[in-house]
Curated annotation (Swiss-Prot):
GO terms for biological process: diaminopimelate biosynthetic process; lysine biosynthetic process via diaminopimelate. One of its GO terms (cellular component) is cytosol. Its main location: cytoplasm. Homotetramer; dimer of dimers. NCBIfam families: dapA. This is 4-hydroxy-tetrahydrodipicolinate synthase. Keywords: Amino-acid biosynthesis, Cytoplasm, Diaminopimelate biosynthesis, Lyase, Lysine biosynthesis, Schiff base. It catalyses: L-aspartate 4-semialdehyde + pyruvate = (2S,4S)-4-hydroxy-2,3,4,5-tetrahydrodipicolinate + H2O + H(+).
């Protein structure tokens, strides 16, 4: 298995007139590769995976894999709050040739820690494919605790975790209970890349990399190489732009930002609505101040 590390983009899913725009997706993926991105993660939260049909998800993942052609990691979004559906999604990712699958904790039905353990264990037993668990309690109302992560790692059921709690004490606990390099630790928060890496993280699955991939790659490289001053300067420079990516619900602002770069339309799928004019102005101003060239 390839090492799951570096600067990865939670890539948006371009849409046009209500349909997935695969041509624009290919162009975005090629641009990411040219900018040095280490991995592409299609069909995640930012990629609106939950509102894609099964056929659309397959098309998106296949398009990314065919475009990348082994030049970067592909970690396919494959989560569900039904274990049997998650298993089928992971099987699809495996069949299509992804490097791993990103599997969010089951949402809405609020399983216990034992339920979470059995969920990921069942996926591993049915697929024998590398899974990155995705812990984002702010969206799922479920928190995958370090003790459970340690059980899963010991059982070989997960290859990594995308941790989106923005809690550095949590990352310290994970390293303590699971082991420094036992699994891949990937930040799910662009705001905390530097401290996350300093606490044992191996990289990030990033939203802002959709519009500033080279800047995010440089931040990750600086943080991982121990260039504290350089990494701190890069993290601080991104702060406002990071905040504006969440001025409304993700991926609304980042899709609007991608459109402002002229790289695809900013169309969203319901129930997500376009960002307001006021929010769009904030996003545009932050992009200009960061030095991005608008279309």
């Amino acid at each position: 298995m390839r090492r799951l590390e570096g600067s990865m983009v939670a890539i948006v899913t371009p849409m046009k007139d209500g349909a997935v725009d695969l041509r624009a997706l290919r162009e975005l993926a090629e641009w990411q590769l040219a900018e040095g991105t280490d991995g592409i993660v299609p069909c995640g939260t930012t990629g609106e995976g939950v509102t894609l049909t099964p056929a659309e998800r397959a098309d998106v993942i296949r398009t990314v894999i065919e475009t990348v052609r082994g030049r970067a990691l592909v970690i396919a979004g494959a989560g569900s709050n039904a274990t049997h559906e998650a298993i089928e999604s992971v099987k699809l990712a495996k069949t299509l040739g992804a490097d791993a699958a990103l599997v969010v904790t089951p949402y809405y039905n609020k399983p216990t820690q034992e339920g979470l353990f059995r969920h990921y264990q069942a996926i591993w037993e049915a697929t024998r494919f590398p899974v990155v668990a995705y812990n984002v309690p702010s969206r799922t109302s479920v928190d995958l605790l370090p003790e459970t992560v340690a059980r899963l790692a010991k059982a070989g059921a997960i290859a990594g975790i995308k941790e989106a709690t923005a809690n550095m004490d949590r990352q310290v606990q994970l390293v303590e209970k699971v082991g420094k390099d036992a699994i891949a630790y990937l930040s799910g928060d662009d705001f905390t890349v530097l401290p996350y890496v300093a606490c044992g993280g191996h990289g990030v699955i990033s939203v802002i990399a959709n519009i500033a991939p080279r800047a995010m790659k440089e931040l990750v490289v600086a943080a991982r190489s121990g260039d504290l001053a350089g990494a701190l300067a890069k993290q601080a420079a991104m702060a406002e732009l990071n905040r504006m990516m969440f001025v409304e619900t993700n991926p609304g602002p980042v899709k609007a930002a991608v459109a402002l770069l002229g790289r695809s339309g900013g169309e969203l799928r319901l129930p997500l609505a376009p960002v307001s004019e006021a929010s769009l102005a904030k996003v545009r101003d932050a992009m200009v101040r960061f030095g991005l060239k608008l279309a």
